[in-house]
Amino acid sequence: MADLNKDTVNFVENYDGTESIPEVMPTKIPNLLINGSSGIAVGMATNMLPHNLTESINAAIAILESPDLEVEDLLKIIPAPDFPTGGIINGTQGIIEAAKTGRGKVILRAKTEIETDKKDKSKIIVTEIPYQVNKARLVEKIAQLARDKRIDGLLEIRDESDKDGVRIVVELKTGTNPEVILNNLFALTPLENSDGINNVALVNNVPKVLNLKEILDIFISHRRAVSYTHLRAHETVED
């Protein structure tokens, strides 16, 4: 939003012509890469995953200092997407492919731990869940599997989440193998989830699939255009 009122970007009419809206925002950080984006239009779709703020800015700075950097170099700065709900990325091949081509797949697992007491009674504790997984529906799915006896050994499911974070407790029957139960939960519930990456964005009003370097290059070009326009406007006022 900074400098939006200083004629740094073009304004266009909204859908019914009643207001003027900015064609793009004069952002100072690579928001598209940081926040990600998801949407469907006629004949195309986009699913860009979120990335770490500091890593994204550092990557942009690295390109400014060394414009010939390759995607492989940028992956040392931004090794993977950064999900607000946490989770564990299972494998990196899909991430590398997406960084190079703009398309790929990432498999995300919940972060879990197993607690076993002296009576051989175990609990599976879930402390982070995959990106965009609804926690209430996840808990209900596990409970439904227990009711339908599709997974033997489930005793009780509780959502103990609070302001400090996610905590889902899955109590198991005595003598049950918790590793087997956990693998079944990964297979049958969104505790393991795959996300397709499709980095489609409008570049000069034309949809294009972008790799990691292209996303950052376009952001840098945008910032240069905004800064140049701002400078010219400032000089005009002084004249």
Model-derived features: positions:
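Core structural elements
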Residues: E23-T27, I34, L210
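A glycine-rich phosphate-binding loop feature that marks nucleotide/adenosyl-phosphate handling sites
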Residues: F11-D16, L75-F83, R158-D164, V200-N205
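P-loop NTPase nucleotide-binding/switch module
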Residues: L4-T27
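Gly/Lys-enriched N-terminal cap/neck module of very large, oligomeric protein machines
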Residues: G104-S227
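Conserved helix-loop functional segments at active or binding sites
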Residues: A2-K6, N31, A62, S66, ...
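Conserved small/polar residues in nucleotide/adenosyl-binding loops
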Residues: T229-T236
